[in-house]
């Protein structure tokens, strides 16, 4: 991967997260603490973040310091999420499908642990980890902002609009 593409990938991922956070915080939310609110799955606004994965903001502002947030990640079967880390703790609950998670600086299929619907994993800030969506998967991510994805090796990130390899 050349430096131009690397720069594009990093900028695209950061931009998508910022757009999703900003878009959600600008919407009038009935879950702002003054009243309860229901968000229907069909009403979620999904934004592609990497090839095979989309992100939707449910609650809070993931870019704001110390602010609680809830996001959903939807991935197609076979999608690899390269090794990365976050500056804050990350809590993940599998809602649908089979999701596999591994810890370390580099994707290693032998170290993946399988999670099924209802399973939960909590990763402390700065823990390097990676994932594989074994089947079509939806996971819910919650924590305190600012939530940011820092790729261990950005050249492994496949942009959402990348064409299949020939």
Listing of model-derived features with the role each one plays in the protein:
Residues 69-86, 114-115, 124-125:
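Conserved short histidine dyad/triad with adjacent acidic residue
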Residues 81-83, 101-102, 123-124, 128-134:
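Short beta-strand His + acidic residue motifs that chelate non-heme Fe in jelly-roll/DSBH
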Residues 105-126:
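Short acidic-glycine-tyrosine-enriched beta hairpin
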Residues 9-19:
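Bacterial N-terminal signal peptides
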């Amino acid at each position: 991967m050349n430096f131009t593409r690397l720069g594009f990938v990093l900028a695209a991922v950061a931009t998508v997260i910022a757009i999703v956070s900003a878009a959600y915080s600008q919407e009038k939310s009935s879950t702002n603490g003054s009243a309860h609110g229901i968000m229907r799955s069909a009403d979620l606004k999904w934004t592609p973040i990497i090839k095979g994965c989309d992100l939707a903001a449910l609650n809070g502002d993931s870019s704001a310091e110390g602010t609680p947030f809830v996001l959903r990640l939807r991935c197609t079967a076979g999608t690899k999420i390269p090794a990365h880390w976050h500056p804050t703790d990350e809590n993940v609950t599998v809602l649908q499908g089979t999701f596999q998670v591994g810890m370390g600086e580099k994707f290693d299929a032998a170290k993946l642990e399988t999670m099924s619907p209802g399973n939960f994993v909590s990763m402390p800030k700065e823990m390097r980890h990676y994932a594989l969506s074994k089947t079509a998967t939806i996971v819910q991510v919650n924590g305190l902002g600012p939530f940011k994805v820092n790729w261990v090796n950005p050249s492994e990130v496949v942009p959402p609009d990348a064409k299949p390899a020939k």
